[in-house]
């Protein structure tokens, strides 16, 4: 019997490990609910923790990112939300939809490209009373180059492709089959730098 070369066995083992390592996150981000897909991760106590435990109410009431506590949490559509206080939990429980970030808490700039990238809870923006999360400062700045245009694109791709889909497969599809307006991170960074350089 012919043996597989070492590099093939190593590659197969790495592929298997990578696929198994992603199962927890893949399951957490794709609950069987109206929130699918959602920016959630498993942790020690919760299998689908939204935005790594950021208090979604605090963005509206305190106008800042605040980390929630496991002491104050609610479940909505199969996803766990944490809050910094009992008061914030009560506000959420009265009207959860009022406090949910757009696009399941994924990076709004990524959604404009049809790609559900994880959002960074401390990089956010309120636009017309709605909460948008971004993957980092560079992503937010790129989105702000054309807020109206990027919102139109994000709404289109969220409605037509991302909402209700499996985040992993959608991300994989759009990383291979890019949208017509796709720009690399370097191209976006150059546009942001040029915009900042203008008087």
Show the residue positions of the predicted features:
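C-terminal motif of bacterial Sec signal peptides marking the signal peptidase cleavage site
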Residues: 19-22
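Intrinsically disordered, low-complexity terminal tails and linkers in eukaryotic proteins, enriched
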Residues: 24-77, 98-199
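Short, well-structured hydrophobic secondary-structure segments
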Residues: 78-85
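Short, solvent-exposed recognition patches
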Residues: 85-100
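Structured alpha-helical
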Residues: 16
């Amino acid at each position: 019997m012919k043996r597989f070369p070492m590099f093939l066995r190593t590659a197969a083992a790495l592929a298997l490990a990578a696929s198994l390592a992603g199962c927890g996150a893949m399951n957490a981000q794709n609950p069987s609910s109206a929130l699918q897909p959602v920016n959630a991760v498993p942790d020690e106590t919760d299998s689908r923790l939204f935005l790594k435990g950021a208090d979604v109410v605090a963005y509206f009431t305190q106008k800042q990112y605040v980390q929630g506590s496991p002491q104050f949490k609610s479940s909505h559509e199969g996803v766990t939300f944490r809050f910094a206080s009992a008061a914030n939990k009560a506000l959420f429980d009265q009207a959860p939809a009022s406090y949910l970030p757009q696009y399941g808490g994924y990076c709004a700039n990524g959604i404009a490209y049809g790609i559900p990238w994880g959002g960074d809870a401390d990089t956010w923006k309120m636009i017309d009373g709605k909460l948008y999360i971004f993957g980092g400062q560079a992503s937010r700045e790129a989105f702000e180059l054309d807020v109206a245009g990027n919102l139109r694109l994000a709404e289109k791709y969220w409605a037509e492709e991302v909402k209700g889909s499996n985040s992993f497969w959608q991300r994989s599809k759009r990383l291979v089959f890019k949208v017509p307006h796709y720009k690399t991170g370097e191209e976006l960074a150059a546009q942001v730098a040029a915009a900042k350089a203008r008087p």
